[in-house]
């Protein structure tokens, strides 16, 4: 009856109220299902490792390569320079090496 009265005032108001009621009922009924879907304690992952890590072995059992400590890099010769390095601006000024 209330829906009929709302429909007389505004045609879409009754439909909107009806859809909101259906949505509210559906949401209220789905709440208990969430607690049933929770993972049991027996299947939860352990918080600590059962064995301590041995060295630096990764997941595949391979030791990672560590780069050797390098000192200052030697200056690249003109033939070894890459395009992304850009031009050496010190070549353009006569007093750069003073």
UniProtKB/Swiss-Prot annotation:
UniProt cross-references to Pfam families, sorted A to Z: Frey
Complex and partners: Interacts with SPPL2C (via active sites); the interaction stabilizes FREY1 protein and inhibits SPPL2C proteolytic activity. Interacts with IZUMO1; the interaction retains IZUMO1 at the endoplasmic reticulum membrane and coordinates IZUMO1 complex assembly.
GO biological process, alphabetically ordered: fusion of sperm to egg plasma membrane involved in single fertilization; gene expression; maintenance of protein localization in endoplasmic reticulum; protein N-linked glycosylation; protein stabilization; protein ubiquitination; protein-containing complex assembly; sperm-egg recognition
Disulfide bridges in this chain: none
Intracellular or extracellular location(s): Endoplasmic reticulum membrane
Protein name, as recorded: Protein Frey 1
Protein origin, superkingdom: Eukaryota
Transmembrane segments: 13-29
Keywords: Endoplasmic reticulum, Membrane, Transmembrane, Transmembrane helix
A single GO molecular function term of this UniProt record: protein-macromolecule adaptor activity
One Gene Ontology cellular component: endoplasmic reticulum membrane
Membrane topology annotation: Single-pass type II membrane protein
InterPro entries linked to this entry: Frey
Region named Disordered: 60-87
Function: Key regulator for male fertility expressed transiently in round spermatids where it recruits IZUMO1 at the endoplasmic reticulum (ER) membrane and coordinates the oolemmal binding multimeric complex (IZUMO1 complex) assembly. Upon complete assembly of the IZUMO1 complex, its ER retention is released, facilitating IZUMO1 complex export to the acrosome. Through the interaction with SPPL2C, inhibits its intramembrane protease activity directly accessing the catalytic center of an I-CLiP.
Main location: endoplasmic reticulum
């Amino acid at each position: 009856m209330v829906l009929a009265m709302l429909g007389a005032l505004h045609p879409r108001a009754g439909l909107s109220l009806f859809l909101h009621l259906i949505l509210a009922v559906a949401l209220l009924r789905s709440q208990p299902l969430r607690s049933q879907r929770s993972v049991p304690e027996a299947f939860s992952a352990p918080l600590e490792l059962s064995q301590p890590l041995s060295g630096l072995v990764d997941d595949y059992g391979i030791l990672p390569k560590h780069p050797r400590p390098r000192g200052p890099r030697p200056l690249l010769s003109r033939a070894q320079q890459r395009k992304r390095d850009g031009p050496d601006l010190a070549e353009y000024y006569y007093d750069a090496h003073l």
